[in-house]
Regions:
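Cytosolic, membrane-interface loops and tails of multi-pass inner-membrane proteins
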Residues: 1-7, 116-141, 186-196
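Functional transmembrane core segments of multi-pass inner-membrane proteins
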Residues: 76-124, 142-145
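Structural signature of hydrophobic alpha-helical transmembrane segments
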Residues: 40-51, 105-107, 171-177
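Small-residue-rich segments of transmembrane alpha-helices in multi-pass membrane proteins
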Residues: 75-89, 136-141, 202-216
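Extended hydrophobic alpha-helices typical of membrane-associated regions
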Residues: 164-222
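Intramembrane alpha-helical segments
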Residues: 4-96
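Multi-pass membrane catalytic core of lipid/isoprenoid biosynthesis enzymes
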Residues: 1-35, 132-167, 207, 212
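Transmembrane alpha-helical segments that form the membrane-embedded catalytic/substrate-channel core
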Residues: 51-63, 83, 87-88, 106-121, ...
Length: 222
């Protein structure tokens, strides 16, 4: 957005400051409601994780050593949007740790990385021109496509594994509906030649990831 001139660096800075302060205020309130004063250690730990998340979000594109432009963006998206958000939320609300939750957390992380990968595939020409060494730029178009397939298929496999380990009813596989547009996306990516045409696919994968999270949760609750 900044590099294309849609918004100015000052506007971006103001938006980041506002979002950071607002997010931290909400995080502190949520942590206090969840743990109170009785579990001060947990409160401190989650507050530090919140700070780490904010720092990771800022460091993604800000500064000369921004990790988003050194091929590490996918790893951080997987960790913070997948493992930390899913497992962390579960601990926050239940005060328990379930190792098997790392399976659906991995699914969310992989799909989040797929969104980023698709975004970077769309922008790879511009990123090359601005010396932004994303993973797609490093891999090249064909390998980036294969990587995209692996992310989506990996998300499916880990979700199915979790359900198989907790299987009670067919409705637990409700989340498979979300993979219909995701598999259609794989077909589009495989046939893609003009990177700009991937722009419309970005929204589809993002919404499919959201749909997966909703349907997966409903399937496990019911």
């Amino acid at each position: 957005m900044v590099s294309s001139g849609v918004i100015s660096p000052k506007e971006m800075k103001r938006a980041m400051i506002f979002t950071t302060i607002f997010s931290l205020c909400i995080a502190v309130l949520l942590i206090y409601v969840a743990f109170g004063r009785e579990n001060f250690g947990y409160s401190v730990a989650f507050f530090m994780l919140g700070l780490a998340s904010v720092a990771a979000a800022i460091k993604y594109t800000v500064g000369e050593s921004a990790y988003g432009y050194s091929g590490l963006g996918d790893i951080f998206v997987f960790l913070f949007f997948g493992l930390l958000s899913v497992v962390g939320s579960y601990i926050l609300f239940t005060h328990q740790i379930n190792a098997l939750l790392f399976l659906p957390a991995t699914s969310i992380g992989l799909l989040s990385a797929a969104v980023l990968n698709l975004n970077n595939m769309r922008d790879q020409i511009e990123d090359k021109q601005h010396h932004k060494n994303t993973l797609v730029v490093s891999l090249g178009s064909q390998k980036a496509k294969i990587y995209h397939y692996i992310l989506i298929l990996g998300a499916l496999v880990t979700a199915v594994l979790y359900v198989e380990m907790h299987y009670q009813a067919p409705i637990q596989y409700l989340f498979l509906i979300a993979f219909i547009p995701l598999f259609l996306n794989i077909k589009v990516v495989a046939q893609n030649i003009l990177f700009s045409e991937l722009d419309s696919e970005l929204k589809k994968v993002t919404l499919s990831t959201f749909l997966f999270a909703i349907l997966f949760g409903i399937g496990q609750i019911l």
